[in-house]
Amino acid sequence: MSSHKLEVFTDYVCPWCYLGDSRVKKLKKIFNIDIQIIHFPLHPDTPKEGKSLLDLFVTNQEDIDNKNQNMKNLMSNENLPYSNRTHTFNSRLAQEIGSWAQSLDNKTPIHDNFFEAYFVKGLNIGLESVILEIVAKSGLDENEAYDIINNRTFKSSVDKDWEKSRTYGVTGVPTYVYNNHSVVGAQPIENLVDFLNHFGVTKL
């Protein structure tokens, strides 16, 4: 475990976080640093069945099509698959399961699998059945995850993340925090490298 820790404030339904996650992986290949995912409430009031992007952004289909195409272009530059989004979904339970998975193994693939389920497959990651499929794909115990979802075992863990977001003044994601300093947005990898170099983070 490294003595250097980069906190990444993120939400599974944030396209910029999906993009930023790819760049964080590149950082891990350059620096001896631990990544700590801090869950952020991007659209916490989204109903279980989801909300259309038309309603979320109060816009028209042409605008949604343009947004999707712009994101596809950006994702393509990172070699990330990306499908047209039509809805956003409530990510709260997914965050609780993500917090559980991270407590078991900081290198868990579950974060990648939640991003893939939503941004590539268009699945509603707020549904228990979908979450359990992602748990299984991530090599984790479905029965334990079922109990965690229904008992809300990791509710307080995500509550603390949300409170940390407020304490740090985080209003947009992704936000990267190191040594009480932050950068906001899906920054180019060069900017993130400069950010960590500034604090003398050890390179591999």
List where the protein language model places each region.
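C-terminal cap of thioredoxin/glutaredoxin-like
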Residues: S2-T10, W16-I33, S99-L104, P109, ...
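Structural alpha/beta surface segment adjacent to cysteine/selenocysteine redox centers
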Residues: Y18-K121
